[in-house]
């Protein structure tokens, strides 16, 4: 197995630790994850599960047979074997993600299986981003033969080559920062341009791996966004061009550079490295399954914890020392909310709870943070919904105790949040850009509200005590359908016209929400012997929209496959669990 430095230089490696080449160059010798070994890591005497055999190109997730443990086992921190559980009505405590390392004192680890392109060619990469090209071009394609986005050593470039690379980079950076009202929080355009000038050769050896990593992720996300716009604007009757699209080649190139830098970033992270990891968690939503997305988000959170971004003291210090960087705390909150949503909907314990965060929420931060009131109010409600979602999951599925009084308190809290969301939707907006941005944000809040209802009323649906979950599923399907259905042509035009760097997150949320809603309706349909299969109107609407959304994010086809897989026997259910990202929900169908 070659070390990362030899891989980057495309040289043979002797496999020693350190290898001869790294010793000669006097650089740190780092090896990626060995796919021949079990990916479980020992952490404080416990096995911390690292998803096994998971690569960018894997279509299947291989699980391990779970070992049921009592809740006492977790509280006493005894050794347990985390796994992919076959969920029953309750959560298997053995599947809860480790809550250790919340103070950043333990060395961080990163599983490169989630991001490595070692076993992938360009064809795999393009397939994941929804791109295609003639197969015979893929067979002979080499990394240094891809379009105009080559990044060879600058020492061999003419001045014209340098100018061309600068123009290409500026174009991709402008894709990310073109709309001043919606740019990645905590990342400044001027800083990215400065990094671009400083690192003319992204593959050169220097001491700013975090800066190169951030620049590479920005350029990759810019290229992905640009290519997605090109694909959505392309005439379906127009024949495909020969060769690799230039922008797609650039995305592949910058992605490879970024992933090679991950070990160095994790070894000594700073603000640039954290921002780069959050951006990578963003665009990886179109490339890896939900479990991988959760793991990637948790790794970024671990870096944030190591940098103390979750603490009030760090915020207070930055107000004085570097107020221009306060947006990084908004980035932290965005990441935390996304992580909570993914964790609870996948039947996992969130990595970091609100009790361990002393950082003030966005609406309590000083006005030096450059964000619109709409975004700040959205973040306030989003944090409240994520907090409630975590509370529901812990009380109902981890501790298994939710008496009538507490249940009614949570219902009241959810009702109050629903009222606040309704009031926010009624706020008058007449600016065109803000109008379309608000539509996306309001739909996101509606989805998050539905997630809370799904978790809260899931047991009642299984026990046939109430249909609150069914009602929530029907309502959110109609709202998502009205936003994305191609039966209304303007929806498709709006998606193309307003597609920006953050396109993957809203589409991921919509697809995930529709899929869970469909499972809930399937469970409801099982109780109606007189109703034929696919006889629920909203279910058919949801499937139609999901089929439209996978044209933009192809990996979400997995979710559609989960809705149609046979689960007539326990054996069928066990087999489907190997690929089932939503087994926490689909296993309801076997109850």
Swiss-Prot record:
One of its GO terms (cellular component) is nucleus. It comes from the Eukaryota. Disruption phenotype: Impairs pulcherrimin production and subsequent red pigmentation. Residues 3-29 bind DNA. Keywords: DNA-binding, Metal-binding, Nucleus, Transcription, Transcription regulation. Signal peptide: none annotated. SMART domains: GAL4. Its main location: nucleus. InterPro entries: Fungal_SecMet_Regulators, Zn2-C6_fun-type_DNA-bd_sf, Zn2Cys6_DnaBD. It is found in: Nucleus. GO terms for biological process: positive regulation of transcription from RNA polymerase II promoter by galactose. GO terms for molecular function: DNA-binding transcription factor activity, RNA polymerase II-specific; RNA polymerase II cis-regulatory region sequence-specific DNA binding; zinc ion binding. The keyword Disulfide bond does not apply. Transcription factor involved in regulation of the PUL gene cluster that mediates the formation of pulcherrimin, a red iron-containing pigment composed of two cyclized and modified leucine molecules that acts as a siderophore, a chelator that binds iron outside the cell for subsequent uptake. This is Transcriptional regulator PUL4. The gene is PUL4.
């Amino acid at each position: 197995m070659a070390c990362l430095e030899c891989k980057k230089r495309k040289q043979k490696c002797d496999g020693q630790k350190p290898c001869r080449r790294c010793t000669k160059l006097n650089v740190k010798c780092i090896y990626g994850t060995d796919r021949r070994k079990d990916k479980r890591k020992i952490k404080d005497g416990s096995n911390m599960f690292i998803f096994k055999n998971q690569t960018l190109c894997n279509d299947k997730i291989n699980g391990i047979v779970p070992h049921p443990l009592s809740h006492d086992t977790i509280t006493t921190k005894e050794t347990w074997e985390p796994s992919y559980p076959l969920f029953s009505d309750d959560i298997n405590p053995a599947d809860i993600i480790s809550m250790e390392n919340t103070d950043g004192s333990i060395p961080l680890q990163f599983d490169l299986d989630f991001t490595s392109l070692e076993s992938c060619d360009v064809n795999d990469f393009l397939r994941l981003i929804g791109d295609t090209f003639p197969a015979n071009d893929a067979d002979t394609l080499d990394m240094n033969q891809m379009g105009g986005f080559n990044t060879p050593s600058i020492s061999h470039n003419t001045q014209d080559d340098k100018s061309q690379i600068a123009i290409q980079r500026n174009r991709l950076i402008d894709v990310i920062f073109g709309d001043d009202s919606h740019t990645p929080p905590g990342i400044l355009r001027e800083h990215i341009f400065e990094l671009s000038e400083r690192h003319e050769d992204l593959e050169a050896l220097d001491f700013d791996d975090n800066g190169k990593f951030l620049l590479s992720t920005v350029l990759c996300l810019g290229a992905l966004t640009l290519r997605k716009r090109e694909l959505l604007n392309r005439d379906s009757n127009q024949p495909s061009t020969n060769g690799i699209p230039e922008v797609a080649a650039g995305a592949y190139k910058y992605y490879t550079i970024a992933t090679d830098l991950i070990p160095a970033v994790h070894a000594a992270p700073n603000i640039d490295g954290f921002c780069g990891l959050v951006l990578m968690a963003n665009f990886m939503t179109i490339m890896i399954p939900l479990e991988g997305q959760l793991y990637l988000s948790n790794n970024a959170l671990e870096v944030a914890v190591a940098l103390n971004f979750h603490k009030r003291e760090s915020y207070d210090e930055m107000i004085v020392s570097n107020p221009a960087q306060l947006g990084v705390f908004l980035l932290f909150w965005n990441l935390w909310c996304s992580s909570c949503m993914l964790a609870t909907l996948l039947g996992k314990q969130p990595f970091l709870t609100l009790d361990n965060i002393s950082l003030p929420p966005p609406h309590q931060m000083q006005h030096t943070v450059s964000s619109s009131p709409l975004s700040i109010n959205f973040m306030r409600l989003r944090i409240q919904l994520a907090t409630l979602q975590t509370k529901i999951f812990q009380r109902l599925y981890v501790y298994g105790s939710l008496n009538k009084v507490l249940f009614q308190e949570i219902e009241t809290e959810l009702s109050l949040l629903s009222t606040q969301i309704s009031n926010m939707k009624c706020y008058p907006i007449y600016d065109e850009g803000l109008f379309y941005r608000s539509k996306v944000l309001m739909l996101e809040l509606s989805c998050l509200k539905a997630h809370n209802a799904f978790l809260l009323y899931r047991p009642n649906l299984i026990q046939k005590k109430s249909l609150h979950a069914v009602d929530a599923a029907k309502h959110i399907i109609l709202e998502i359908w009205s936003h994305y259905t191609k039966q209304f042509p303007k929806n498709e035009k709006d998606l193309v016209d307003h597609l920006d760097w953050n396109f993957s997150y809203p589409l991921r949320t919509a697809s995930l929400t529709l899929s869970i809603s469909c499972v809930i309706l399937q469970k409801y349909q099982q109780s109606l012997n007189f109703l034929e299969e696919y006889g629920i109107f909203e279910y058919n609407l949801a499937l139609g929209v999901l089929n439209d959304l996978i044209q933009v994010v192809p990996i979400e086809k997995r979710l559609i496959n989960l809705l149609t897989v046979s689960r007539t026997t326990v054996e069928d259910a066990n087999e489907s669990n190997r690929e089932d990202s939503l087994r926490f929900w689909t296993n309801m169908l076997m109850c």
